[in-house]
Amino acid sequence: MTSRRKKWGAAVAVAIAASAMATTTQAAGAKPAASKQGGEISVGILNTISGWCFANALTGDALGATRMVYESLVERDSRGRFIPHLAESWASSEGGKVWTFKLRAGIKYSNGEDFNAASVKQNIDIGRGLTSAPGFSTRYASTGIGINANIMSVDAVDTTTVKITLERPDNDFLGLMYRAGRYVMRAPAQIADPNTCSTNGIGTGPFKIVSYNPNELVVERNPLYWRKDSAGVQMPYLNKITVVVVKEASQRAAAVRKGVLDAASFTTGEATFVKDLQNRKSVVTEYAGNAGSWGQWVPNQNKAGSPFKYQNCRLAAAFAINWPAYNKVRLKGMGVYSGSIVGKEHIMYTRSGAPTYNLAKAKEFVTKCNADLTAAGVTTGFKLTLYADTSTQSLNNTKEVQKYLEAAGITMNPIFQAESAVLIASIYRGGGNLYDFAEGTPAEGPGSGYVLPFFVTGAFPANSTNPIAKTPFGIGYNKVVALGNHSDTQVDTLLYAAQAETNATLRKQKFQAATAHIQATGMAIPTLHTATYTFVNKKSKLKGIGLLKNPDGKTFAPTRDIKGLEWTGVWQER
């Protein structure tokens, strides 16, 4: 824990004890100003903001913090549908093999540089590992190389038109271009300097950075922002937002309850404190997201010495974990257990082949697993290590899972704890995941676009003609997003056939067949689907949350996404 965070934690504790209201809020009796513009607020989050460049993998509310600065071509509306944002429209051709995006004209990055087709091409080309792209640095190699493996070329047709050609047809390509809110556009000036790229985020978004370290971000209103409200007032409305990392949910909850923080985000894993805040309706307002972060634990099959090389070991773990009980004990029933690696509304949903909790079966498979290991010369038996974030809630949640595995006869090492940013970097690294499991994946959303990449044998199929596949980066990152690190090419055959299918009924059937195979072989264990929750102190008088109209005129409910609130249209009554 850094000294900066210790100081913040101490400050929160003192403020909670000394005050019932944050210094950034207005007195309850104050009259609202005629203008919506102005105001400064503070927001508490769980996850460390590890950085702003291509290689910085962020999750949940840390991702949401960076989205104050960054924007993407594609967004989602209140119903989860993909809608235009920096792009004003798109069209697919050649059966989903070519995608053409028309960009909005006249947009600038916060430093004054033009947002245009050349900039979009630069961002996508660097993200996919094209070393000849302007500004490319070896430091920019990232999971994007695997995620973008199906992209063969990116062409700037004119200033506002970008054409993306794929190796294989993909009728869910918009899901990949959204990428759970991660597919953001960075300014050329940020990309130009690899020494500062991770600390100097420059985007087209409503705010720009004033100061930044991994545990505290201060942003101010971007005067060059391109959006106006229906009255012609330039957005955003707020002048400044301070985002602080408060690891302990107890402190974060107390801070937003007392008004030390104007708003704070929470995960389903922090259910004890979410439930408590839900019961304080006179003090805070809740903005809850959909349970669209798909619960998937993925056994790492090719980690050196991993018992998960053997299907019996994978199925032993799958049958051992009592997810419904875990949901009741640790998540207070707030998780959603669909019995599948995706939710019931998803095109890939099926319970076929999925193991469900059965201790007797788990013990049978543990015996078979140990026999497999003994035959392979392993004398230590079935042994695993789980990991947890440094927060108390994360550790206690992991202990509950470990208890179920031990009950089935699996030997468990001490839980490994590290910052979430460290864990993410160790899972999504060149050469593959360092841990026995990927205890969850970034997979989310209504389509297969940001689900499929995590289950194929590698980012690039064996017969790929993509020139990046044979480069050191293509080889090094081929297994990064394929979290199971497996070699079952039947998964590829099933998923790619479904991806290319244009008949809606057949497409769903093909995706379900792929899911059934993944579940039956223990390649991914169905767990609990979770959401993000944001609570706002009522004395902060924040208005307009969830009411902002998108550029296409649709109401956007950003609380539905894992990244939390959309702050562009939020204003403070004064």
Each predicted region: which residue ranges?
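N-terminal lobe/hinge region of extracytoplasmic solute-binding protein
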Residues: 44-94, 125, 202
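Structural transition elements
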Residues: 207, 336-370, 388-396, 502
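Long beta-strand-rich cores associated with HINT superfamily self-processing modules
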Residues: 534-574
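Extracellular/periplasmic solute-recognition and catalytic clefts
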Residues: 46, 130-139, 210-220, 242-305, ...
